[in-house]
A protein has these predicted regions:
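Short, mixed-charge low-complexity intrinsically disordered segments
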Residues: 46-93
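Compositionally biased, intrinsically disordered low-complexity regions
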Residues: 10, 36-37
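Small side chains
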Residues: 16-19, 32, 44
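Short aromatic-glycine-(Arg/Gly/Cys) micro-motifs in beta-strand/loop hairpins
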Residues: 5-27
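A short, exposed loop/beta-hairpin motif centered on an aromatic-Gly-Thr core
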Residues: 26-35
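Short amphipathic alpha-helices within nucleic acid-binding modules
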Residues: 39-43
Length: 93
């Protein structure tokens, strides 16, 4: 089934997404390590919601900054030097 093959292919590489809030830019930038935009936005939303519960999923801008990061970083977020993966993405923060 072609769709299944595409889904598997889609999940081969973990990417780093630079995420920010359109409505609350003062919240700054979060790097989310995920397979796709949807997961990245959800991760970033979780971080932003700790500071401002009004941040909405649809209000999060995400763009790929790195296309192939170690799989161990999947589902993690990074926004300061204490986080895993910081050395990979510090230039984007």
């Amino acid at each position: 089934d072609c769709r299944m093959a595409n889904m598997i292919k889609q999940y081969e590489k973990v990417r780093a997404f630079k995420c920010s809030s359109k409505e609350f830019p003062e919240l700054g930038i979060v790097i989310a390590f995920a397979y796709n935009y949807s997961d990245a936005r959800n991760l970033a939303k979780g971080v932003f919601n700790e500071v401002n519960p009004a941040v909405r999923y649809l209000g999060i801008r995400a763009s790929i900054v790195l296309k192939d990061v170690p799989k161990e970083l999947n589902n993690k977020v990074c926004f300061n030097e204490n986080h895993e993966g910081y050395e990979l993405v510090s230039e984007f923060l």
